[in-house]
Amino acid sequence: MISKLNSAYARKLRRSRERGATMMEVIAYLAIAAVIVAGVLVLLSIAFGQSKTTIALQQLNQIQTAVRTLYSGQSSYQGLSTSVIVNSKALQQSMISGNTLRHAFNGAITITPTSTTDGGANSAFDVSFANVPQDACQQMLTKDLGRGLYEAGASTTAQQPNLPFTLAQATASCSATYNTVTWTFGS
């Protein structure tokens, strides 16, 4: 009879040990879950950064189109300014902050007329995006923006006419953590 009690007790003890997880198993599960969550957050951060870069390039295209449309009958871009474009209501409201323009990374956008060696005074216009993160700066300078682009550059180097930039040129040009990227569009 005692042996039956001992074996019944042993079975009960084994079953109670098999239920649930040990503290080490719980810690291991939590560590794995933390790694997965961290990975998802990193991927989301990258995706949102890519999205902002795409939006900034779309904003640049909208600005270029708005300026060219407003000045299509003019012989030059004389009188062009950021406030002229803001007041024209030719851009999305999400870009306008008072009398200024903001790009997807929340930096200021400046639009000014400029001169080129082959076009003369006020024959082109500059669009500058301030405070562009380094990785976005590199991506933006390596994009082919079409025939109307005269030259481009970032805050640490002079503008260059050989466009689009190679990755090495963009990396060298966008060496600061936050850069001012300027594009010059000709006629």
Task: Give residue spans per PLM region.
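N-terminal leader/signal peptides at the extreme start of proteins
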Residues: M1-R19
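Short, flexible active-site loop motifs that bind/organize anionic cofactors or intermediates
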Residues: S16, L43, V127
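Residues in soluble alpha-helical coiled-coils and helical-bundle/repeat scaffolds
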Residues: A31, V35, S72-S75
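Residue-level recognition of specific faces of alpha-helices
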Residues: G20-V26, Q59
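Membrane-proximal N-terminal amphipathic helix
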Residues: S45-N87
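C-terminal juxtamembrane segment of a hydrophobic transmembrane alpha-helix
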Residues: M24-V26, A33-S51
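Periplasmic/extracellular, small/polar-rich flexible segments of pilin-like filament-forming proteins
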Residues: S72-S187
